[in-house]
Structures are given as C-alpha cells and as structure tokens.
C-alpha cells in the first residue's frame, strides 16, 4: 500500500548544512517512517508528518 513506503511529494528543506527537511504532504495517514504524525479530528482525517529529516523521501506519485 502507499502508506507503508515512506514517500513525499511536497518536501521543503532549509539551506543549512545539513539541511532540515519537512514533508508537507497531507493525507489520511502518515508514511510508515514518520515518528510524529499530526492529524485533524475531521473525517476523513487530514494528517501530516511533522518529523524533521536531513533528506527528502522519494516522490509518492510517479510523474
């Protein structure tokens, strides 16, 4: 399934070294590698991962 593989379509990084990157994708769940997932109480929920990493995951959508 899509949720099991860590991926991100919209990733923002700072210009620092190492970069601080955050995935801004919003979906019904967060990817499997996400440690800090924040969801709204709406239905369906809108979740995003608030983890900060030094890299971006591969894009979820194959364009």
Curated annotation (Swiss-Prot):
Residues of the site described as Reactive bond for trypsin: 15-16, 41-42
Top-rank taxon, per record: Eukaryota
GO cellular component, one term: extracellular region
Cysteine pairings via disulfide bonds: 7-60, 8-23, 11-56, 13-21, 30-37, 34-49, 39-47
Keywords: Disulfide bond, Protease inhibitor, Serine protease inhibitor
Pfam families, A to Z: Bowman-Birk_leg (PF00228)
Stored SUPFAM superfamilies: Bowman-Birk inhibitor, BBI (SSF57247)
pH curve summary: Stable at low pH.
Temperature-activity note from the record: Thermostable.
InterPro entries reported for this sequence: Bowman-Birk_prot_inh (IPR035995), Prot_inh_BBI (IPR000877)
GO molecular function (one): serine-type endopeptidase inhibitor activity
Protein family membership: Belongs to the Bowman-Birk serine protease inhibitor family.
Function: Inhibits trypsin stoichiometrically at the molar ratio of 1:2, with a dissociation constant of 4.2 nM. Does not inhibit chymotrypsin.
Assembly description: Monomer.
Protein name per its UniProtKB record: Bowman-Birk type proteinase inhibitor
